[in-house]
Amino acid sequence: MNVVKNIADLRAAVARARGEGKRIGFVPTMGNLHAGHIALVKKAGQRADFVVASIFVNPLQFGPNEDLDNYPRTLAADQEKLFDAGCHLLFAPSVEEMYPHGQANQTIVRVPGVSEGLCGGSRPGHFDGVSTVVSKLFNMVLPDLAVFGQKDFQQLAVIRTMVRDLNMPVQILSEPTVRADDGLALSSRNGYLSADERATAPVLYRTLNQLRDALQGGRRDLPALIDEGLEALRNAGLRPDYLDIRNAIDLQPVTDASSELVILAAAYLGKTRLIDNLLVDLRTSA
């Protein structure tokens, strides 16, 4: 696996692979890799001949009181994991390489509608930072396909919409959320949890499962269901940021015609913000 830190070397390496007739797969990350990231890399390897990963802790997607400075940076360990997963090229740029004219002067890519509300409501500007950095990375790598995890469901929807609206020639693939044995969605931020908090954290997933069971059992009183879910989270010691049920296709409010739903939640446990979601197919309901 080659490691490059500047755009010129990245483009040269990708051009060589493309010149050999190889299909390019891409997995953008912020590092501190876990099994969820590795599943994305392996999926890219199944669908492409040459896998590029990036590690870049993107300051544009962090708010002023968020964990940019404390976000784990584990490049050496990440390189080993990527190599073992079959990655061919790692792009690990500096902030200066990505934003040479300064962050304040960076052109911003904003995806209206789907980026608003949910995490976008709680983290103003977050998805502007995500869509901006991903569009830059797509322009640098020029991949045939890119793989994103379903754990960040709203992010996946934002990227799909951006690619559609800007006519980007890249196929977006998704990979199901990878979970610990007790159901907790794997996340780089899980390392912030204390032992007691880690023991409590799976209640988020259990609550989403209870709501999914209710929906598949025929309940359609969404406001009451959401209130029950919020109460369950609070009773377990979590501080809900949001809990909502949306149309899974476009994240719009549920209508009578909706058959594919997604339950989305974010909640604080101590100082750690956890997010999760579950898809619900009403066509398979009891």
From Swiss-Prot:
Q: What is its EC number?
A: 6.3.2.1
Q: Does the keyword ATP-binding feature in the UniProt annotation? A: yes
The family database entries (InterPro entries) matched by this protein are listed as: Pantoate_ligase, Pantoate_ligase_C, Rossmann-like_a/b/a_fold
Q: What class of enzyme is it?
A: ligase
Give the binding site residues for beta-alanine: 61
Example of a GO MF term? ATP binding
Any one of the GO CC terms: cytosol
Instruction: Identify the residues that bind ATP.
Output: 30-37, 149-152, 178, 186-189
Sorted keywords for this record are: ATP-binding, Cytoplasm, Ligase, Nucleotide-binding, Pantothenate biosynthesis
| A Pfam family | Pantoate_ligase
Q: Which GO terms describe its biological process?
A: pantothenate biosynthetic process
Q: In which pathway does it act?
A: Cofactor biosynthesis; (R)-pantothenate biosynthesis; (R)-pantothenate from (R)-pantoate and beta-alanine: step 1/1
Sites binding (R)-pantoate sit at: 61, 155
Chief location of this protein within or outside the cell: cytoplasm
Which cell locations does it reside in?
Cytoplasm
Keyword Ligase part of the UniProt annotation: yes
Residues in the active site? Answer: 37
- Catalytic reactions of this protein: (R)-pantoate + beta-alanine + ATP = (R)-pantothenate + AMP + diphosphate + H(+)
| Family indicated by similarity | Belongs to the pantothenate synthetase family.
The record's annotation in NCBIfam families points to: panC (TIGR00018)
What is the protein's known function? Catalyzes the condensation of pantoate with beta-alanine in an ATP-dependent reaction via a pantoyl-adenylate intermediate.
Q: Which HAMAP family match?
A: PanC
Additional record remark = The reaction proceeds by a bi uni uni bi ping pong mechanism.
Q: Cite the record's note on assembly.
A: Homodimer.
**Record protein name field:** Pantothenate synthetase
Q: Gene behind this chain?
A: panC
